[in-house]
Amino acid sequence: MKKTIPSESNRLAYPPIPVLFLLVLLTVAAGCATVGGSTPDSDIETLPVESKDRVHVIFINSPLDVLQIGRLAGVASYFRSKGFQNSSFHYLSSGPKLAGEVRDLRREDDGTRIALVAWSGASLWVWDALKELDETGERVDLIVYLDSNWIKKRVADEGHPDNFDRAVLIYRSDNPPVEGVPNSVIRRVETTNHLAVAAYPDTVQTLSEELVRLAE
């Protein structure tokens, strides 16, 4: 059954006015995001509460998606409704801010599981955070890049930190994924619309599987 969900550095800047108009025009094309797939809700809901509470998921909005057309906040809300109460959404962030948040979480509980989910250009903030954490021997458990082209040049020019256990690269069907990310797997979503990827049913399905894996 499908469920409707609520809807620096190469370096990041706010989009010019024409880009904002383009985002508005593409809102309809992005469509209505639904959650579906083969992982039953019971796979999440039967996990012990303490296992889900140990997982902290930070969803980071694209700096270009100022209108939140990608609906990543709705994805975070969906996972909170499924018991992953420590799912947070950042409208804006930075590498140092994310690194500081990871350190704070580790300080509170060194057994916590941390996932960073970056929509499009937010991948550069995750890269920056990992680089900073790597300098002090710190790491995260999972990173997810959602259809990011921004990260491709960064990785081609500077490589990618490896201080994480697993990377999931979720890309639309006509967009080649970034290459050179260690410990990574590629997941495709059957859309050619960049703005639809973050809340696409296949994306949410993959995130469900990854969070269950992380909590177990």
Which residues fall in each region the model found?
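Bacterial N-terminal signal peptides
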Residues: V19-A29
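Solvent-exposed, acidic/flexible segments
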Residues: L64-L72, Y91, G95, W119-V126, ...
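Bacterial N-terminal signal peptides that target proteins for export
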Residues: K3-F21
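Active-site catalytic motif of lipid deacylating hydrolases and related acyltransferases
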Residues: V35-T112
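Serine-dependent carboxylesterase/thioesterase catalytic core
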Residues: F79, N86, A99-V181
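Lipolytic serine-hydrolase domain surface
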Residues: L64, A73, V155-E216
